[in-house]
Amino acid sequence: MRHTQRRTRSARRGTATVEMAIVLPVLIALVFGSIEICQRLHVKQSALIAAYEACRVATRPISDTADVQTHAETLLTQQDVKQATVSIRNMTQAKNNINNIVTGDEIRIRVDVPWGANTVSHYVIGDSAGSFRVEAFMLRE
């Protein structure tokens, strides 16, 4: 009787070890995958907020291209968004600056951000290829 109980107990321990060996990597992948997705959402939202806020600055009558560029880059730096490119365009006059813009002209702020510089996974799996782009449009006041 005792011999049977010992065998059953050690078989259960072996089963638990095998289950943990299978489930633990899945749980780790799930946790790190969730962290990666949340970080990418945060970076994208930060870039969108920077584009929107820069567009708000651009709509003011007293602002110029340098003010808008500086404001967008400051917001991106504060949110730790790396290697972002900000472009400012007067869509109505088809110019890449907002100097000499008139009331009612459409302004576009575009922010391009590479994934590789802004995610944790590039330390593990190498440089993440690709980038994303966000845009904000407003009319000059």
Q: What kind of feature is each model-predicted range?
A:
Residues 2-3, 52, 56-141:
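Short, conserved structural patches
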Residues 2-76:
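Alpha-helical assembly-interface signal, strongest on the long, hydrophobic N-terminal helix that forms
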